[in-house]
């Protein structure tokens, strides 16, 4: 009986190691941050915000992840807000931020 038990031990050990490896890989995949999500980031947009509250503006063009142009403003408070890219006030904000960036 001892020889059969010792023959099964390596198979059992390999199966246990494989199971632990799969569990660890699954947890890493579930907890890993997604760099570029395959959806639009802006579900709601603001028509405008005061320029003095904005630290930077990021414009994302349409692509496979989202069919809309997205304007995301980073505020001085650390928050991010989505702005309506077709709103007149937002267009002025983008122009001012671009002019500010090109002047520096």
Curated annotation (Swiss-Prot):
SUPFAM superfamilies given in the database record: Interleukin 8-like chemokines
Short name of any one Pfam family annotated for the protein:
IL8
Indicate the secretion signal residues: 1-30
Q: Does the keyword Signal apply?
A: yes
Q: Where in the cell is it found?
A: Secreted
Q: Its principal location?
A: secreted
Give GO terms for biological process: immune response; inflammatory response
**SMART domains listed in its UniProt record:** SCY
Q: Report the protein name in the record.
A: Growth-regulated protein homolog alpha
Please tell me the species this chain comes from: Bos taurus
């Amino acid at each position: 009986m001892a020889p059969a038990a010792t023959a099964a031990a390596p198979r059992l050990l390999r199966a246990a190691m494989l199971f632990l490896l799969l569990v660890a890989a699954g947890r890493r995949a579930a907890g890993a941050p997604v760099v570029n999500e395959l959806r639009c980031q802006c579900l709601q947009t603001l028509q405008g915000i005061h320029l003095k509250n904005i630290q930077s503006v990021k414009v994302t063009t349409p692509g496979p992840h989202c069919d809309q142009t997205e304007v995301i403003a980073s505020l001085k408070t650390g928050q991010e807000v989505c702005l309506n890219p077709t709103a007149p006030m937002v267009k002025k904000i983008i122009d001012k931020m671009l002019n500010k960036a090109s002047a520096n």
